[in-house]
Amino acid sequence: MENTLVKSLYRDTDKYAGQTVQVSGWIRNLRDSKAFGFIELNDGSFFKSVQIVFDTELDNFKEIAKLPLSSSVKVEGKVIATPGAKQPFEIKAEKIDIEGLSDSDYPLQKKRHTFEYLRTIAHLRPRTNAFSATFRVRSIAAFAIHQFFQERGFVHVHTPIITGSDTEGAGEMFRVTTQDLNNVPKGEDGQVDESKDFFGKETNLTVSGQLNAEAYALAFRDVYTFGPTFRAENSNTTRHAAEFWMVEPEIAFAELGDVMNLTEDMLKYAMKYVLEHAPEEMEFFNSFVDKTVLERMNNVINSDFGRITYTEAIKVLQESGADFKYPVEWGIDLQTEHERYLSEEIFKRPVFVTDYPKDIKAFYMRLNDDGKTVAATDLLVPGIGELIGGSQREERMDVLVDRIKELGMNEEDYWWYLELRKYGGTKHAGFGLGFERFLMYITGMANIRDVIPFPRTPGSSEF
């Protein structure tokens, strides 16, 4: 007999009612009495489990009744519709085969476990409701983002993980080397001789695929990357991880307004898709994790995003009379409290803040005519603050070179990036979405460690 997915049973209960089916899965819960028992069986295809009813007609009734949690079984039985019960159907078992026994010391017993504890058993936590929901939504959201760009003719570019340049100019990068760390070759000046390393120069794990994506945007027009990025930032916060995923589109012949429109469209598309394709998971988050999740998402989907310049935002914050922990003055990088005040109290919806001071933004952002600000934008959303950052890129060779020199960066490291301006450069723009931050926003999960399957944070590289 062919295996039937639990998802299929839930999606088309009427079709299967009265039929004999075979399902395979893991025991999430088991209750028994002398004459009969109930198994909550989850096969991984659906958020909800299926209830298996078994009784003494089974030859191995006593053996089944004593099975430890997480044991895997194969069940044959009849689908019985139960419209008045908690679940729409159950399966009356006619045969249960044991596929794999679980030891009695299985750590996920019938009690609530803290997220902190579950991080210590990250290899088992997807078996819990919270993480089953989280990582299915992660998969669905990733697909939605790919589909959004593919439907619009974007080319998906795989950018390198190992790089010789620092996109952000922040210097917080993981070094890549094959040098013998007990005998590192050094030059006459006593410094490490990078020419003796594998790549013949200093290399690092990428902090962004943006620069490489720009190269392809100037050939394919509309491109995007979706891949892992790495920051050697020693921050033990709920919002930082050493390894995370970024969505980074680049569009040629485009200005800042174009990329803001793209940002708004993508965000609404992805949220709608998740709500449509993960209704059970989203209901779980709204009931047990954050009771504002659905309201927040619908607010984003149904709002026209606001727009305000950084200079105007500073004035609004200064005149608000709010008691901020961090003082507000022109030139500062907005703190989370400022961002949330703008999106929650002033606009009550997502808002783009544009035209930031050049001194607090990256070297590649286009210098505005005032010489003080750049064509950059941050999207601020209620409940979290900054969600997405984007900019129009500097297409003028002389201005870009001056900016690189001004920041004390090595011009030679960016020779190929500068050549993009030399050979038919044009206005272009893009944004970066931290995928995990997006997941935190739509699930209500409060810690980035809980939306990454195996998080990498300072002092933690288990699994």
From Swiss-Prot:
Q: Which GO terms of the cellular component aspect does the record hold?
A: cytoplasm
Which CDD domains did the record assign? Answer: AsxRS_core (cd00776), EcAsnRS_like_N (cd04318)
- ATP-binding listed as a keyword: yes
- Which PANTHER family does the UniProt record give? ASPARAGINE--TRNA LIGASE, MITOCHONDRIAL-RELATED, ASPARTYL/LYSYL-TRNA SYNTHETASE
Report the subcellular localization.
Cytoplasm
Per the record, a Pfam family?
Answer: tRNA-synt_2
What is the protein name for this chain?
Asparagine--tRNA ligase
Task: Check the record and name the SUPFAM superfamilies matching this protein.
Answer: Class II aaRS and biotin synthetases, Nucleic acid-binding proteins
User: Which reactions does this protein catalyse?
Assistant: tRNA(Asn) + L-asparagine + ATP = L-asparaginyl-tRNA(Asn) + AMP + diphosphate + H(+)
**UniProt subunit comment:** Homodimer.
Q: Which HAMAP family match?
A: Asn_tRNA_synth
| UniProtKB keywords | Aminoacyl-tRNA synthetase, ATP-binding, Cytoplasm, Ligase, Nucleotide-binding, Protein biosynthesis
Give the originating organism: Bacillus anthracis
